[in-house]
Regions:
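Core segments of cupin and vicinal oxygen chelate
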Residues: 2, 9-52, 80, 86, ...
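Conserved beta-strand in the GNAT
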Residues: 51-56, 114
Length: 120
């Protein structure tokens, strides 16, 4: 038996708004029919677009640092930092460790994510 990663799921206060933000970040359209309760990116697509991103409204707010977070790669870290801040992300920190550079952000609901300078 084998498994594969089907989805990355975010608990959130407003699924449609957070999906719209991440759709812009990922440059992928939000699936039709998204609501404040549930929205997705790529769930309606083929398995080739997996993992999909899902957003599910929950009653409680975020109270602690994420134990898991997405890491995204960017050919131009500086340009991507500007683009993400313009989209509504909050820049938290810049790191350079053993020649690997990345920036940590918060999405509009406070979820951490990193953008790593793609070495290629």
């Amino acid at each position: 038996m084998s498994v594969n990663l089907l989805a990355v799921t975010f608990d959130c206060a407003d699924a449609a708004n957070l999906a719209a933000f991440w759709g812009q970040v990922l440059e992928h359209p939000v699936d039709e029919g998204g609501t404040e309760e549930f929205a997705a990116i790529g769930l309606a697509g083929s398995a080739a677009t997996r993992p999909c991103w899902m957003f599910l409204k929950v009653p409680e707010g975020k109270t602690a640092k994420n134990r898991v977070h997405p890491d995204l790669g960017a050919a131009s870290l500086e340009a991507e930092v500007k683009r993400l801040v313009d989209l509504g992300a909050t820049k938290q920190a810049e790191q350079d460790q053993d020649g690997v550079r990345w920036v940590t952000f918060l999405d509009p609901e406070g979820n951490e994510f990193d953008v790593v300078a793609d070495p290629s």
